[in-house]
């Protein structure tokens, strides 16, 4: 499988994908030069083996060909994406038909206490399940499933292309 992790940060989730996709290839994408460098350090062995690459870029205009990936993940990053529908359409573009898009957020948009983060972190926007589902379906994703933890207010969404 070919996996893309958008907003790969320090690369921990890339390492987890590499463990799960032993015969696959994982690409990390991040806007930050620092994150790209850190992801590269953490996953240096896999990069050397040709199983991984890290790319600097923007989710709203990704440097990948159409239908490049079987699975796309976003852990704790959609909060910062510049225009949800535009970015989801770009995810849809780089995914293969039948591919899976996984979104995991530690905030489900229902906990008022989480709003403190949007005040402290410039450009952050917390979305609830309905907002994410609506934006995904608007750009052609289907079979959108949500899984949440009411106590911790976590939200995971899985959608198919």
What are these regions (language model features)?
Residues 159-161:
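C-terminal beta-strand of the catalytic ATP-binding
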Residues 48-49, 65, 142:
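Conserved H-loop
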Residues 85-97:
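A short glycine-rich, Lys/Arg-flanked "PGG" loop and its adjoining helix->strand segment in the class I
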Residues 60-71:
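A short acidic, Gly/Pro-enriched loop at the edge of an enzyme's catalytic core
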Residues 100-157:
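C-terminal alpha-helical "lid/dimerization" subdomain adjacent to the S-adenosyl-L-methionine
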Residues 2, 99-100:
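Short glycine-centered segments of the SAM/dcSAM-binding site in methyltransferase folds
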Residues 71-84:
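A short SAM/SAH-binding and catalytic strip from SAM-dependent methyltransferases
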Residues 4-61:
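Class I SAM-dependent methyltransferase SAM/SAH-binding core
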């Amino acid at each position: 499988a070919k996996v893309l992790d958008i907003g790969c940060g320090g690369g921990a989730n890339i390492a987890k994908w590499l463990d799960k996709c032993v015969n696959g290839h994982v690409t990390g994408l991040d806007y930050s030069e620092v994150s790209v460098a850190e992801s590269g350090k953490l996953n240096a062995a896999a990069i050397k083996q040709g199983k991984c690459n890290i790319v600097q870029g923007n989710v709203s205009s990704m440097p990948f060909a159409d239908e490049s990936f079987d699975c796309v993940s976003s852990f704790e990053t959609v909060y910062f994406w510049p225009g949800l529908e535009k970015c989801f359409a770009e995810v849809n573009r780089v995914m293969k038909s039948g591919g899976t898009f996984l979104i995991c957020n530690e905030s489900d948009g229902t906990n008022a206490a989480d709003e403190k983060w949007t005040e402290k972190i410039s450009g952050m926007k917390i979305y609830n399940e309905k907002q994410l589902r609506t934006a995904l379906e608007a750009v052609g994703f289907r079979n959108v499933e949500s899984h949440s933890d009411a106590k911790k207010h976590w939200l995971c969404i899985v959608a198919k292309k």
